[in-house]
Amino acid sequence: MPPQGKTPLSAVLTEHGITVLLVDDQAIVAAAVKRMLETETDISFHYCQDPNQALQKALEVSPTVILQDLVMPDIDGLTLVKFFRAHPRLKNIPLIVLSTREEAATKAEAFALGANDYLVKLPDRIELIARIRYHSAGYINLLQRNEAYEALMESRQALASELALAADYVISLLPQPITAGSIQTRWRYFPSTQLGGDCFGYHWIDEDHFAMYLLDVCGHGVGAALLSVSALNVLRAQSLRNTDFRIPDRVLASLNDAFQMQDHNDLYFTIWYGVFNRTTREIRYASGGHPPALLITGAGQTSQLITPNFFIGGMPDSTYESGAVSVPNGPARLYIFSDGAYEVDKSGGAMWTLEELQAYLLPNPPDEAQEIDGLYRFLQGMRGQATLDDDFSMLKVSFIG
């Protein structure tokens, strides 16, 4: 049973009846064929005596099969076959050639020019009706297949527009980069063609505590994007009840209580959430099924910040742990990202790894403003495609001095 609110494709396809067009200069033949078909109430019969009007008549009646005489005045029957096959609206209609003679060479030429069948007139009634039904069924299937394909393309275009609007909405919610002060941020978000559920943000909780977070909802599409936006708004507004947003493990536990899968269309999300204390220069963090954040100091030391927690929404009674790391004096960089930033198939088939991403980010970037863009271009070149299979999201937090 189709989901509520959705119409099955079979219900929107056009029902086509069987329509026969006979092209023959002899009215007696037309009368005979009409008599053969008169008891077949589901077959509509049309007759064209003038071969010069055959194409126009076919355009008017839209036959599902054409019966065409081979020997007619003014136009040779084989030439008329060429005309039918050259017309863009008529070229696929099944065409049965009628002839008074059984000639192998003529048959071969007719088939070579595009005829679908060959009958010596007049055939037995049962045989004629069987061939009409057989060829019409094939053509009707072709029409409905083409119609279904067009409907699918329209649906895909509508979905693409919907996803583009959703992506624009997600981007509009992301915070402005911080370009001055002791904490600075840069980020890039490149949605995939299917639009995943990536979202991120940062804000000052109070004068000393700076929150940073990135989440990734499972799956793709508008549903995933809406859930990520809901979670983002909760974090930005700090609207989880009885939760100290300076304590990451409590934040994840409260998110898990608020966003259980059974209440959100079986969707869950992973998250990395951290809080920097600018007085102590300590980052407290917790991750729920999410890739580690990478902390790179000015001395080139790298730390993977990750905790062994379950993703958000999977189990109601999950407990969460947090970790802590000190940021030494001097410049340091923290990279928070989704798995789309490194789980990228190379053109040769292997997948890029977290360790390779870490090695890529380790050197001080020659142009910090273009660092994340440069990474994305690198992944595009490695993948061999302009768009990656998953959302690419990366947030860089720089600690100055």
Where are these predicted regions, by residue range?
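Active-site residues of response regulator receiver
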Residues: D24, D69, S99
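Active-site beta3 strand of CheY-like receiver
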Residues: V61-L67, V71-M72
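Two-component/phosphorelay signaling modules centered on CheY-like receiver
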Residues: L13-T19, A27-H46
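The feature encodes the CheY-like receiver
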Residues: P73, K82, K91, S99, ...
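C-terminal catalytic subdomain
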Residues: P328-Y335, A341-G401
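… and, occasionally, acidic/histidine-rich disordered N-termini of signaling adaptors
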Residues: A148-Y335, G384-G401
